UniProtKB/Swiss-Prot annotation:
Binds 2 Zn(2+) ions per subunit. One is catalytic and the other provides a structural contribution. This is Fructose-bisphosphate aldolase 1. It comes from Paracoccidioides lutzii (strain ATCC MYA-826 / Pb01). Zn(2+) 1 binds at residues 111, 227, 266. Induction: Preferentially expressed in yeast cells, the host parasitic phase.
Length: 360
């Protein structure tokens, strides 16, 4: 049985119970869905092509900075207005184009720290407006990241937002335990290493609190994760901690499931296949990738420019003749497409690494 056999909506953006079914199926079949950060229609297309070609479900997500870029750098963002508008624009674009690729897509928003809560509020306003018209939220899910705050305030505030999302059957991802490194303007490179590891007791408290509100939630637990890419050996991941979290929650709740918690792997760029495989075996259903894909996109553009540099120095004139036009080389559709190709190839690798290929 494949993913499409269990979903009520087979292609395009899925919501509510379909998201829950997808994550349940992922745990049962021991695979995780790549969560790809997108910042433009071009990166959306690259990711969707990879999922189609690998016959796989995919998660597309926009960060606060990525959403602002989607809106345009000329739009003011002092009150998160560009990030709200850009996220909504990305959502409508993805909803419009995703069915053409014949795959199920989870439409998600990435890290929302305390200072960015107005961004989340604005998107939830849009979700509720969309829900009134279509009986489903605009976004499949959101991510609230209050891991830098006290555990108590983190859980209390996350619960408040889950209560708002629950009537729409909207998924909410939360983070406990800081992910190191730097991403999208949030810098945790100097945090104490002990802060990178979540305790089982905290996972249970979160699970108990949130499950009383809604089943539509997942937890990004810290097990040494770091955003960005670093030299081998500089990042010490301990995926085995995730197994302890599952066992502790199972014991405390008396659950019949060996993996009662839907877990998320943040800071996936640069991790080894073995680390991915082990984490997924402990109930990770979503793995975030961003930095690797940024570099993959660049590599296609870079290689094209270096290879064709003699055709890119002027609009007219190249090694074939001083009157020869170069439009077919400098047309943005040409070199942007090269970036899409290399990014798509890297996303395809992720489907293989996470055992997601041919799961539809």
């Amino acid at each position: 049985m494949g993913v499409k056999d269990i979903l009520s909506r087979k292609t395009g953006v899925i919501v509510g119970d379909d998201v829950l079914r997808l994550f349940q199926h992922a745990q049962e079949k021991v695979f995780a869905i790549p969560a790809i950060n997108v910042t433009s229609s071009s990166t959306v297309v690259a990711a969707l092509e990879a999922a189609r070609d690998k016959n796989s479900p995919i998660i597309l997500q926009v960060s606060q900075g990525g959403a602002a870029f989607f809106a345009g750098k000329g739009v003011p963002n002092g009150k998160q207005e560009a990030s709200v508008a850009g996220a909504i624009a990305a959502a409508h674009y993805i909803r419009s184009i995703a069915p053409s690729y014949g795959i199920p897509v989870v439409l998600h928003t990435d890290h929302c720290a305390k200072k960015l809560l107005p961004w989340l509020d604005g998107m939830l306003d849009a979700d509720e407006c969309y829900f009134k018209l279509h009986n489903e939220p605009l976004f499949s899910s959101h991510m609230i990241d209050l891991s830098e705050e006290s555990v108590e305030w983190n859980i209390e505030t996350t619960a408040k937002y889950l209560k708002r999302a629950a009537p729409m059957k909207q998924w909410l991802e939360m983070e406990i335990g800081i992910t190191g490194g730097e991403e999208d303007g949030v810098n945790n490179e100097s945090v104490d290493n002990n802060s990178l590891y979540t305790q089982p007791e905290d996972i249970y408290t979160i699970y108990k609190t949130l499950s009383a509100i809604s089943p539509y939630f997942s937890i990004a637990a810290g097990f040494g994760n770091v955003h960005g890419v670093y030299k081998p050996g500089n990042v010490r991941l301990h995926p085995e901690l995730l197994s302890k979290h599952q066992a502790y929650v199972k014991e405390k709740t008396g659950s019949s499931k060996n993996k009662p918690v839907y877990l998320v792997f943040h800071g996936g760029s640069g991790s080894t296949k073995a680390e991915f495989k082990e984490a997924i075996s402990y109930g990770v259903v979503k793995v975030n990738l961003d930095t690797d894909l940024q570099y993959a996109y660049l590599s296609g553009v870079r290689d094209f420019v270096l290879k064709k540099k003699d055709y890119l120095m002027s609009a007219v004139g190249n090694p074939e003749g001083e009157d020869k036009p170069n439009k077919k080389y400098f047309d943005p559709r040409v070199w942007i497409r090269e970036g899409e190709k290399t990014m798509s190839a890297r996303v395809q690798e992720a489907f293989d690494d996470f055992n997601t290929s041919n799961q539809l």
